[in-house]
A protein has these predicted regions:
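Conserved alpha-helix/loop element of class I SAM-dependent methyltransferases that forms part
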Residues: 65-82
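A short acidic, Gly/Pro-enriched loop at the edge of an enzyme's catalytic core
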Residues: 139-149
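N-terminal auxiliary segments of SAM/dcSAM-dependent transferases
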Residues: 2, 6, 10-41
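A short glycine-rich, Lys/Arg-flanked "PGG" loop and its adjoining helix->strand segment in the class I
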Residues: 163-174
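Core SAM-dependent methyltransferase catalytic element
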Residues: 216-232
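Conserved beta-strand signature within the Rossmann-like core of class I S-adenosyl-L-methionine
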Residues: 175-183
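Class I SAM-dependent methyltransferase SAM/SAH-binding core
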Residues: 87-138
């Protein structure tokens, strides 16, 4: 069995290791630090309530954020049917959904904890439905509901740990790919390596793609794990 942690993890990392890309504005760095410091659902909701209207400018202009487009492209490579029902997990303001729509996907649902972020995402006109959900809790959704899923910017410091993976794969149909990225610094500390290995050992998922890449153009080295796993 392939060990995803072998390529991704090269030395000791802790929950307190938080890398801010170089050469970004002080405003962008401050917001990213605030995001990394989230310690509860309440602080998460408060941050994204305050950040919703300026998030895109901060991430695209201030940080030169590339993860949403990369994750969308990964899903597009592994899900050729553009009429498939796709879930954008932690959709935020819809950056990944916009990229999915540009690739031709027609049936995209967005899921997020922040109503303010989803209100911004709705303006893009690319989503079919929105689902308010806390990924740290069981999802009120039927089994085998989606043909594929994408997730960018959610599996990072202070947001959601690997316990959500069981639920996310549960709502995917057999054979459905899930393309996502995990902040490299939390790959092991927040349990993603172990959870994925367990799910593979149980025969519930298979690995389709795995690589290291940069979340931001301003990053000096790969700071994210980008991968695709399929529900069996």
């Amino acid at each position: 069995m392939h060990d995803p942690g072998r390529a991704a993890y090269t030395g000791p990392m802790t929950r307190n290791t938080r890398t801010i890309p170089a050469n970004v504005s002080p405003e962008a760095a401050a917001l990213l630090e605030r995001a990394y410091a989230i310690d509860s659902d309440a602080t998460s909701r408060a941050l994204y309530r305050d950040w919703a209207e300026t998030y895109d400018a901060t991430m695209l202009d201030g940080l030169r954020y590339r993860s949403p487009a990369l994750v969308a492209a990964l899903l597009g490579e592994h899900l050729p049917d553009r009429t498939a029902q796709v879930l954008d997990v932690g959709c935020g303001t819809g950056l990944a959904g916009q990229s999915l729509a540009e690739l031709g996907f027609e049936l995209i649902d967005g899921m997020d904890i922040s109503p303010e972020m989803m209100q911004v995402a709705a303006r893009r006109g690319v989503y079919r439905h929105f689902i308010a959900a806390d990924l740290n809790q069981p999802l009120d959704m039927p089994d085998a509901h989606y043909d594929g899923a994408a997730c960018s910017g959610t599996f990072t410091h202070g947001h959601v740990d690997a316990r959500c993976l069981d639920e996310l794969f549960r709502i995917l149909r057999p054979g459905a790919p899930f393309a996502f990225t995990v902040k490299r610094e939390v790959w092991e500390p927040l349990g993603f390596k172990d959870a994925l290995q367990r799910l593979m050992a149980e025969g519930r998922i298979t690995e389709s793609a795995f690589r290291l890449d940069r979340h931001y153009d301003s990053s000096e080295q790969p700071d994210g794990v980008f991968c695709v796993y399929r529900r069996t």
